[in-house]
């Protein structure tokens, strides 16, 4: 059992962690921060005057501009 655990940790460290370091642009993205940078607001529903750009954190909230 320890043998399997050792190889699982080794495989995880060799694949997942190195891929995260090599390609940081594919990591997690803070969509709320991206919305604020583009002068948007995270709301449940956009008004008629606002334009819905993307989702914020949850699929139910939208970035409205």
Curated annotation (Swiss-Prot):
Main location: secreted
Keyword match ATP-binding: no
Biological function: Has bactericidal activity.
Cleavable signal peptide: 1-19
GO cellular component: extracellular region
Biological source species: Mus musculus (Mouse)
Protein known as: Beta-defensin 41
Similarity section: Belongs to the beta-defensin family.
Domain of life: Eukaryota
Lineage: Eukaryota, Metazoa, Chordata, Craniata, Vertebrata
